[in-house]
């Protein structure tokens, strides 16, 4: 059934293609989002901004003020990838990756969500035994703005005797722990209602406060089962039996490490999306993988993480869960048909490039419902 044009809701999305393979995977992601929007009955108004190396080349700034303003005025930010080895010699504040910190700060983002779900068709791609990884479906919720990356004092200091000393400070306030805990509990409530909080409360005072506050917030969610693990044990358990986890909540440094460990359970980082959220305003949705400059422009990139990041955008920022489900089902259908990009290819499968993988996903969407579909040659404008 068609939707009357007057009833169609329009969302403003900021697209930040960035560097390396970013423009290629962004083209696929936008086409898929436009296609599913046409099916479900809403529209996307795209605005393009510069970020990372591309922004530095054009403006001398990896995050130009106009890009941040555009992001702040949008309903969601769809990001591809930033960075290139050629920028490694730039001053730290000019490097492409610094744009991500500025974007998160400018949008007030404090919660990073990384879903880790293995498609049945890719169980063999994992380095772990199939019986260990089959059925994995967990989310790592990482606090983004506190902890040792931001605590003060920090730096390298020289004492009176001329000896240098490096200092970083891991610190969290009650308010910071409470707000990230509520994000994790709300997410767990919508899933299997199990939350595991990861800390190092046996030796770190900051973790003792973390555990105390998470336990206190748990009283607001009696329907969610809370458990605690020390981070070293959590790292071991993720490899030993990852299916025990539903939602993992942890602080910045621990989350940085555990989310990458969890990512590799699936066999390819090219499959994994992420979301960074705040209390209000637009979230940022991006693949976990980097810009892969070594394969940029060669049609070799895997666009699936970008596509699945779009599904998260629909679910968390636009409140369009039906559209998100359609995208995820289309990706699974294409994998079931045996199509693989190089990073997930195995013998007997059909090797395709970035663009063709996108076309296959669009075709799978079209099979779900006979509606006008997007095209990779003309993503929405």
UniProtKB/Swiss-Prot annotation:
The enzyme's E.C. designation: 1.1.1.85
Annotated residues for binding of Mg(2+): 232, 256, 260
GO annotation (BP), single: L-leucine biosynthetic process
Annotated pathway: Amino-acid biosynthesis; L-leucine biosynthesis; L-leucine from 3-methyl-2-oxobutanoate: step 3/4
GO MF: 3-isopropylmalate dehydrogenase activity; magnesium ion binding; NAD binding
Residues annotated as site: Important for catalysis: 149, 200
Coiled-coil segments: none
UniProt KW Metal-binding keyword: yes
The protein's enzyme class: oxidoreductase
Keyword Magnesium recorded: yes
Residues where substrate binds: 104, 114, 142, 232
Annotated NAD(+) binding sites: 290-302
Catalytically driven reaction(s): (2R,3S)-3-isopropylmalate + NAD(+) = 4-methyl-2-oxopentanoate + CO2 + NADH
Xref: HAMAP family: LeuB_type1
Protein function: Catalyzes the oxidation of 3-carboxy-2-hydroxy-4-methylpentanoate (3-isopropylmalate) to 3-carboxy-4-methyl-2-oxopentanoate. The product decarboxylates to 4-methyl-2 oxopentanoate.
Subunit comment: Homodimer.
Protein family membership: Belongs to the isocitrate and isopropylmalate dehydrogenases family. LeuB type 1 subfamily.
Protein name in UniProt: 3-isopropylmalate dehydrogenase
């Amino acid at each position: 059934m068609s939707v009357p044009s007057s009833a169609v809701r329009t969302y403003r999305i900021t697209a930040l293609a960035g560097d390396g393979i970013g423009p290629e995977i962004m083209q696929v992601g936008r086409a898929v989002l436009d296609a599913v929007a046409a099916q479900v009955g809403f529209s996307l108004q795209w605005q393009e901004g510069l970020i990372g190396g591309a922004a530095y080349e054009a403006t001398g700034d990896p995050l130009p003020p106009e890009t941040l303003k555009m992001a702040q005025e949008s309903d969601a930010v769809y990001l591809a990838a930033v960075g290139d080895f050629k920028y490694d010699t730039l001053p730290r504040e000019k490097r492409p990756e610094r744009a991500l910190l500025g974007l998160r700060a400018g949008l007030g983002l404090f919660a990073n969500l990384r879903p880790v779900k293995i498609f049945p068709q890719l169980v063999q791609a994992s380095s772990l035994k199939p019986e260990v990884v089959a059925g994995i479906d967990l989310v790592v919720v990482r606090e983004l703005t506190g902890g040792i990356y931001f605590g003060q004092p920090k730096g390298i200091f020289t004492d009176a005797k001329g000896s240098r000393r490096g200092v970083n400070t891991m610190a969290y306030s009650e308010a910071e722990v409470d707000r990230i805990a509520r994000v994790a509990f709300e997410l767990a409530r919508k899933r299997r209602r199990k939350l595991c909080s990861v800390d190092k409360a046996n030796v770190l005072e900051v973790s003792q406060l973390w555990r105390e506050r998470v336990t206190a917030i748990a009283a607001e969610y009696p329907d969610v089962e809370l458990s605690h693990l020390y981070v070293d044990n959590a790292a071991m358990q993720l490899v030993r039996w990852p299916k025990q986890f539903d939602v993992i909540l942890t602080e910045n440094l621990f989350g940085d490490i555990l989310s990458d460990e969890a990512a590799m359970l699936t066999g390819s980082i090219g499959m994994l999306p992420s979301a960074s959220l705040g209390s209000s305003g637009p979230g940022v949705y991006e693949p976990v993988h980097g810009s892969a400059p070594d394969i940029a422009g060669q049609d070799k990139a895997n666009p699936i993480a970008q596509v699945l990041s779009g599904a998260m955008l629909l679910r968390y920022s636009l409140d369009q869960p039906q559209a998100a489900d359609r995208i995820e089902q289309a990706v699974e259908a294409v994998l079931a048909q045996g199509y693989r990009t190089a990073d997930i290819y195995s013998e007997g499968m059909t090797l395709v490039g970035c663009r063709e993988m996108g076309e296959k996903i669009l075709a799978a969407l079209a099979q779900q419902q006979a509606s006008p579909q997007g095209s990779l040659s003309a993503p929405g404008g």
